[in-house]
């Protein structure tokens, strides 16, 4: 069905393949060396499960570093341990239907309402979009600020107004989910 079962993520977490560079205090391996990920990617490429492995590479090497550098201590304590075990799968949502990955054309907005943000818009071609529990979402928060008017907003599975569209058909990488996301 074009989606790697969550059990694969849990198994990867159990064997230390997820969050290896997350500090040990959050359950990670504490490895601060890019070569570990490179070796892992090479080994996985020989297994024939490259679709699910690419989702894990995105999780480990693209998304997790944002949480490590930008999340506050409470967020790290809440999210990082589950990212390491595979209980939480992550995604990053940049690409939009009418703008592609050109951030200057981002139409998705986030407007501050009290202590939270209300996000409106849509994203497409989001790796791990169906399975993800946490989606780091690029939003325009200040239209007057040009390139400085963007923010990364974390959207959690089950949040009101956050819907997943279909799992997109692709020519390859059939075991990797790629989704449309809608925010209203």
What spans do the regions from the language model cover?
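Short Gly/Pro-enriched turn/cap motifs at secondary-structure boundaries
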Residues: 83, 98-101, 125-128, 142-144, ...
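A short core secondary-structure module
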Residues: 116-164
């Amino acid at each position: 069905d074009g989606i790697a079962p969550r059990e694969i993520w849990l198994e990867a977490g159990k064997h230390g393949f997820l969050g290896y560079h997350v500090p040990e205090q959050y359950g990670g391996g504490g490895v601060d060396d890019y070569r570990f990920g490179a070796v892992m990617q090479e080994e996985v490429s020989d297994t024939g499960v490259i679709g699910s492995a690419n989702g894990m590479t995105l999780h480990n090497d693209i998304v997790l570093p944002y949480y490590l550098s930008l999340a506050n201590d409470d967020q790290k304590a809440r999210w990082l341990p589950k990212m390491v075990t595979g209980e939480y799968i992550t995604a990053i949502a940049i690409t939009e239907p009418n703008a592609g990955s050109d951030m200057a054309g981002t139409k998705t907005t986030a407007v501050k309402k009290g202590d939270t943000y209300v996000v409106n818009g849509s994203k497409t071609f989001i790796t791990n979009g169906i399975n993800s529990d946490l989606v780091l979402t690029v939003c325009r928060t200040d239209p007057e600020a040009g390139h400085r008017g963007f923010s990364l907003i974390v959207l959690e599975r089950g949040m009101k107004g956050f819907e997943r569209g279909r799992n997109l058909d692709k020519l390859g990488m059939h075991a990797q989910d790629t989704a449309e996301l809608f925010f209203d």
